[in-house]
């Protein structure tokens, strides 16, 4: 005897409101994503800041609500300080995640200027691979503190008087993966994420922080990772 299934549709029935940020994206220093992707000084389609106008128009058309930066695996070996200040004074580094050379011509302030132009909210990722609490608290002081401290005053010296007031932050990237620079156990990552969050909120209590879940459901620590990390952070 065949079993018949019935499906009832009710377009007015709602369980909850969908967070529009689920339609967000991210940009990483990988391949041509940044250099010659969104940023290419001298290109016929580049504006005075080096941003590709044709790419910006496409992103505006997509109406991407939020964009994460600078990665991705890239963030786990990244020193955010390398990407601020006069471009000609920025260091060129060996980039270990994707085995390339990073010029740091495009950094934090360029990203913030670019997101403002495309109408997307920024989401900054914190390096919890090779760095941690100190670098994170300095970064949020640079971006979110009004002034009167070393890092906030340095932002002003770089030409950005008003704080960015970045609200959404990601604590690391795929930290469960052995491919990640500074790969950690769930216990190690959970404790570091919790302490980093604590320090960042002392600088700005209004921020929203996101921890890393499992990279995919085939990871040997899948589900156990989430339970352990959240036991420290939630």
Language model features with spans:
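Non-catalytic accessory regions flanking glycosidase/transglycosidase catalytic cores in CAZymes
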Residues: 1-234
């Amino acid at each position: 005897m065949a079993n018949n299934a019935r499906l009832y549709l009710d377009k007015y029935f709602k369980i909850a409101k969908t967070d529009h940020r689920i339609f967000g994206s991210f940009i990483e220093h990988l391949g041509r994503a940044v250099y010659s992707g969104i940023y290419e000084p001298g290109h016929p389609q580049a504006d005075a800041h080096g941003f590709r106008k044709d790419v910006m128009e496409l992103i505006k058309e997509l109406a991407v609500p939020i964009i994460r930066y600078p990665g991705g695996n890239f963030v786990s070996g990244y020193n955010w300080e390398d990407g601020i200040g006069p471009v000609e004074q920025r260091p060129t580094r060996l980039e270990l995640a994707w085995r390339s050379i990073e010029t740091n011509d495009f950094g934090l302030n360029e990203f913030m200027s670019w997101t403002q132009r495309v109408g997307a909210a920024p989401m900054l990722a914190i390096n919890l691979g090779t760095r941690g609490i100190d670098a994170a608290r300095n970064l949020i002081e640079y971006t979110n503190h009004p002034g009167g401290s070393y890092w906030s005053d340095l932002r002003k010296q770089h030409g950005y008087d008003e704080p960015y007031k970045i609200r959404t932050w990601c604590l690391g990237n795929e930290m469960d993966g052995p491919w990640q620079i500074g790969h950690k156990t769930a216990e190690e990552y959970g404790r570091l994420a919790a302490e980093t969050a604590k320090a960042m909120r002392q600088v700005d209590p209004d921020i929203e922080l996101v921890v890393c879940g499992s990279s995919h459901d085939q990871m040997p620590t899948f589900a156990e990772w989430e339970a352990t990390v959240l036991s420290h952070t939630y």
